Amino acid sequence: MNKRDAINHIRQFGGRLDRFRKSVGGSGDGGRNAPKRAKSSPKPVNRKTNVFNEQVRYAFHGALQDLKSKPFATFLTVMVIAISLTLPSVCYMVYKNVNQAATQYYPSPQITVYLQKTLDDDAAAGVVAQLQAEQGVEKVNYLSREDALGEFRNWSGFGGALDMLEENPLPAVAVVIPKLDFQGTESLNTLRDRITQINGIDEVRMDDSWFARLAALTGLVGRVSAMIGVLMVAAVFLVIGNSVRLSIFARRDSINVQKLIGATDGFILRPFLYGGALLGFSGALLSLILSEILVLRLSSAVAEVAQVFGTKFDINGLSFDECLLLLLVCSMIGWVAAWLATVQHLRHFTPE
């Protein structure tokens, strides 16, 4: 930096410093020519608050000016952040809607219990009572041998063949519906093992094949969403950190002047922190807009597919709480990335 550039930077910073002093302490002459006022008790707390507010305003204004000075580069950075955040947001919405569809359209898993044919009605009622008393059982639907035969006759259409039989070949059936807390794979297996030990039970079958497939599918979608989210958060962190680093190098002459006249690291650091937070917030806001556009475009297609299957399903986007959380998290990521990039530069910076 030559002598003329240094003088220009000092003049610019001196003008900003004068405006800062005027806004905080009144006129620029330190109050020497101001009319005398009645003495009053000092208010150091209010003065400190005014100084802090003015520093925040100055730093925020500097961050905005820095972003506005290079609009194309800022736009590209925000677009990269938005696209990086849109992918995990869409994956999360897919995971959330798959869970909603599973809850809405799939029944709870059931355990079918076949009783021994030698049991009479009283013994069968005792077995059903034991099933109902088991931990984790919500409800037991009992079907006697006669009811099972009548239902099979109506369903199969082999009424004539069944009439030729001398005795009823079907056993009594008890359908056990577990509680919501016992609908996991391990809990169902434990409940099935306990039911098998009850006297009077011939066979136990667990109708959870579809449930296991659905749980595996939703778990896979959730893990993929989490992995993509972690990678995209790292990408956003690197993008914001690199953008702030380039901004620091572009303003190294101004930082040099500020260091020479005694500016603290916190004063130099604050505009870059606000700039990183603004980049994260803007990218997250644009990501929410892109995600909502994608939901609106896919809603009609999903509705048509659901209509073909004779049902109705609506895609749910991100809720207000989820949108607010995304904005806050991305702003914090931008803040931390800018802090790391700026601190690393100031640590090795030597005024010239």
From Swiss-Prot:
Gene Ontology terms describing biological process: cell division; division septum assembly; FtsZ-dependent cytokinesis; peptidoglycan turnover; positive regulation of cell division
Main location: membrane
Topological domain spans for side Periplasmic: 96-223, 297-322
Keywords assigned by UniProt, alphabetized: Cell cycle, Cell division, Cell inner membrane, Cell membrane, Membrane, Transmembrane, Transmembrane helix
Pfam family, one: FtsX_ECD
NCBIfam families, alphabetized: FtsX_Gneg
Homology family: Belongs to the ABC-4 integral membrane protein family. FtsX subfamily.
Other facts noted in the record for this chain: Overexpression leads to strong inhibition of growth, cell filamentation and eventually cell death.
Assembly behavior: Forms a membrane-associated complex with FtsE.
Name of this chain's protein: Cell division protein FtsX
Organism this protein belongs to: Escherichia coli (strain K12)
Annotated gene: ftsX
